[in-house]
Amino acid sequence: MLVRHSETDWNAERRWQGHADVPLNDRGREQAQRLAEELAAEKLDAICASDLARARETAEIVGATLGVEVVVDPDLREIDVGSRQGRTWSEVDDQPEWDGEPHEAHAERVLRAVRAIAERHPSQRVLVVTHGGSMRRLHEHLGLDGGPFGNCTVWACAWENGSIRPLD
């Protein structure tokens, strides 16, 4: 199961976050607590998260509520958005040139992380807390619609025969 982190002030302000280490805001912490309550019946075996504060904090709130330790993996990070980082969406509307991490490299990195998690936890229920762009890359890899994914959006999926597949 993959989930996008809960809300930050930069989400609320519609700012590009990328690798910026922006913490959750109060609403984000409340969202993470609600997510934990919703996932209580899932009997998770493990929780893995991006090392960026917004994903790590989301995972830690869920983990503390469910009694599951969080393992951090930097390969689950959001795409590096280059010079867009910290700027609002409207500020970059007329900046067509992308100077961040290539989408292909981001997809490779996130797939590598998910594959490693699946190999460490065969036949187990794992929650992976990551970012909207990371979830988008996985959807694109499968030829699915690439979002957008709101904060705390959960995507039920499984790793089978060396590949990720959606469950819903």
Enumerate the predicted regions with their spans:
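Loop-to-helix element that buttresses phosphate recognition and phosphoryl-transfer chemistry
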Residues: 1-56, 99-111
